[in-house]
Design a protein with these regions (language model features):
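Short S/T/G/P-rich N-terminal loop/turn motif that feeds into the first structured element of a domain
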Residues: 1-92, 99-103, 133-138
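Short, Lys/Arg-rich amphipathic alpha-helical interaction segments
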Residues: 95-138
């Protein structure tokens, strides 16, 4: 399995996201890798680390998640790899749940989400987003 971190989805990935999705809630598993130092597209000066810039984004996302009926299910720092092998570990894992794929898209289009997303881009070196559906409680 080849793993490639990204910050922006490809056209093919976006087309899949815009297609009709599963009925009901989805959960997005986010594997996050932060930059050592935040880097803003507008070249603003900053002393923030990537994790600090992403934390600004995260605080704003909590508000926009609630507006579309979503919620943060889990968030934690990666401490070690228990099984398998990767070249480099992610820094953090977060799982957000949305009422539907359409609700996630609605959130991404909110003006306040657009405003805070600059901190996401500034802080992330890469990310994997894994959509899950049909949650099962074991």
């Amino acid at each position: 399995m080849e793993v490639e971190n990204a910050v922006i989805p490809t056209q093919e990935q976006m087309a899949g996201f815009l297609a009709p999705g599963p009925d009901g809630p989805i959960s997005m598993v986010n594997l996050l890798k932060f930059k050592d130092k935040a880097s803003y597209d507008d070249s603003r000066e900053t002393e923030l680390t990537g994790a600090e810039a992403y934390a600004i984004y995260s605080r704003g996302v909590m508000k926009t998640l609630a507006k579309v009926g979503g919620k943060l299910v889990f968030s934690g720092e990666v401490s070690r790899l228990m099984l398998g092998e990767v070249e480099e570990l992610w820094d953090s894992v977060a799982i957000a749940q949305y009422p539907s794929r359409a609700a996630m898209l609605e959130m991404m289009q909110l003006p306040e989400y657009q405003e805070i997303s600059v901190h996401r881009s500034a802080g992330l070196a890469g990310q994997l987003n894994i959509e899950t559906a049909n949650a099962v409680i074991f």
